[in-house]
């Protein structure tokens, strides 16, 4: 009864399609957030609940959905692919699309890198962020640059594998955590470590705990946090 009477309802797409509480219900507007991670059939199912508007919000260059299925080739194509919003040649456009092309979060150097290599130079940085750029670097061990690459190729640090096939690398984990600790000691309230592999995230998380450091959980604003790319996204 509560869901039927509510003017605004928030739910996951899985619950929307599987929970009988939504049977027969429709809404004037349906907003689908993080749409790049959804299967197209899920978006169609959500759209079926909208009587007037379906708004899809997401990043056409983020990771697509993951599928373990015989139909994975189809399911792993996101809505932006099906609508041909991004054609892979640097052209983005669709009569239905509104692009939010000004970013307010990243250091300008990071945004410029993403803009050049991912968004065909369409991403811009807001002026206040540009003006405070040097302030963002003050607590970094390498305060002259917002972007640093550390080459481990000469350290003989081979990856290990779990039974499920996920990778982990002890040396890489130690160095990543050392960098995070250095930034934390220099005054950064929160430091995030991102890795492609769940096993590596678990390894670094355990290192953080073993060293007695504060492992930043969801909802807190200080400490060191490590997760996979998909978990962050």
Describe the function of each predicted region.
Residues 14-16, 20-233:
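Conserved helicase motor core of SF1/SF2 NTP-dependent helicases
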């Amino acid at each position: 009864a509560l869901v039927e009477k509510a003017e605004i309802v928030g739910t996951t797409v899985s619950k929307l399609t599987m929970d009988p509480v939504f049977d027969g219900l429709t809404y004037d507007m349906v907003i689908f957030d993080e749409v790049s991670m959804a299967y197209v059939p899920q978006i169609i199912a959500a759209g079926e609940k909208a009587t007037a508007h379906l708004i899809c919000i997401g990043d056409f260059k983020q990771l697509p959905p993951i599928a373990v299925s015989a139909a994975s080739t189809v399911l792993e194509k996101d809505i932006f692919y099906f609508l041909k919003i991004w054609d892979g040649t640097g052209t983005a456009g669709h009569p239905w699309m509104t692009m939010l092309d000004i970013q307010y979060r990243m250091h300008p150097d990071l945004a410029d890198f993403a803009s050049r290599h991912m968004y065909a130079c369409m991403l811009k940085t807001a002026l206040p962020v540009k003006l405070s750029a040097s302030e963002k670097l003050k607590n970094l061990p390498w305060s002259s640059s917002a972007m640093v690459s550390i080459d481990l190729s000469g350290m003989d640090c081979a990856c290990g594998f779990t039974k499920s096939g996920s990778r982990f690398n002890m040396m890489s984990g130690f160095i990543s955590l050392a960098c995070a600790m250095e930034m934390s000691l220099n005054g950064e309230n929160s430091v995030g470590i991102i890795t492609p592999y769940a096993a590596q995230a678990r390894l670094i998380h355990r290192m953080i705990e073993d060293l007695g450091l504060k492992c930043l959980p969801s909802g807190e604003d200080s400490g060191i946090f490590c997760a996979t790319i998909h978990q962050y996204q």
